[in-house]
Design a protein with these regions (language model features):
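Structure-specific nucleic-acid interaction/processing domains
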Residues: 2-15, 21-105
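C-terminal single-pass membrane-anchor helix
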Residues: 102-131
Length: 131
């Protein structure tokens, strides 16, 4: 069993395509702990999708196919030039592995700070109400 997976941003752009012969959980965990991609990529992910394949070879071929189809900005250019001289039926559906950000919501680095400010203001208002 193997998987081809993709990272999708909040604008529904495919920003990275990869494959793994491991479980999806293990591979995604590796991305977020020992990630080889720029931090900007990981911060841009809204959703992770995957397709399950019968063999690692199938997953590798489909990785190259999808990189050439989507031209993700965080894939290395060496795989984007690979050409497949075979007919591929692109009929399998992507399944959602994990939703990280909801679509159509703008996430900013300051969101964490704003959240704490709002929590602080709410706590202050509650304390002021009871005093």
């Amino acid at each position: 069993m193997a998987y081809t997976y993709r990272f999708v941003d909040t604008n529904e752009n495919v920003i990275y395509v990869g494959y793994t012969g491991q479980t999806m959980a293990k591979r995604i965990s590796q991305h977020f702990t020992k990630g080889h991609l720029p931090k900007k990529c990981y911060k841009s992910i809204a959703r992770i999708d995957y397709i399950k394949w019968d063999s690692k070879s199938d997953a590798q071929v489909m990785e190259v196919y999808y990189i050439n189809k989507y031209h993700p900005k965080f894939n290395k250019l060496d795989k984007q030039g690979d050409r497949l001289n075979i007919q591929i039926e692109d009929e399998k559906e992507w399944e959602v592995y994990q939703v990280i950000k909801k679509p159509n919501i703008k996430y900013e680095a300051e969101d964490g700070i704003l959240t704490w400010i709002m929590i602080g203001a709410l706590v202050y208002a509650i304390i002021s109400f009871f005093i």
